């Protein structure tokens, strides 16, 4: 069973400023807007990061799940870990693992040649976990949330190359890691105090919440080619920075030089 980290979704109070920060600071392009998220009271934009994607959603009406999440976590931040399964059977296995561990299915779509399963963030503790499959079974190509194809010419890796990992935080990192391990069918790797799961192309790390925002998707690790340029542009746009990290859309982006 192979599971690819294909997309990371952030949630923001306002879409345009978040997308402007992400694209200008990280040297990325927008590639797709999905009108179907309007049924959830949201608007969105997707940005390719290598052959994978960063998405931002924002509420366009009151009383939405995204709006409640913003209130609960005190502002913009991480929202969903979105994965792609190599086969339909792999997707079904993750879904079965979730149900066996008391995790509810929050939303499902079944269409000819495409299937989506979202697992409830209340049960996954740190974020939604979404598992998608489509008949192309191409982990670096066709991707339904980005319109299938047509996004490829928007890929720019001159500054930001790809995802390396995601940081999930909570009050009990060991329990959080064990839960995600059971659902994804991937063993926990323990290196001293560090807990992680390895997906096909990225690592999920589990850490103690220390920022006062509670459990959530707290950070994204990126492979980059121009860390200094990223930090300079982030400072110019008023985003908090350290020597190897910038906070954009309420999310810690750790910059790992290639």
List each model region and its residues.
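Vicinal oxygen chelate
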Residues: 4-13, 45-47, 55, 67-165, 196-198, 202-208, ...
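Surface-exposed interaction/gating patches
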Residues: 4-5, 9, 149-193, 202-203
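Amphipathic alpha-helical segments
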Residues: 16-29, 92-101, 172-187, 236
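A short beta-turn/loop motif at secondary-structure boundaries
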Residues: 36-39, 110-112, 212
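Intrinsically disordered, low-complexity segments enriched in Gly and acidic/Ser/Thr residues
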Residues: 174, 178-182, 188-221, 225, ...
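An N-terminus-focused feature that recognizes amino-terminal "leader" regions
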Residues: 1-64
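Short beta-strand
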Residues: 35, 107-110, 189-190
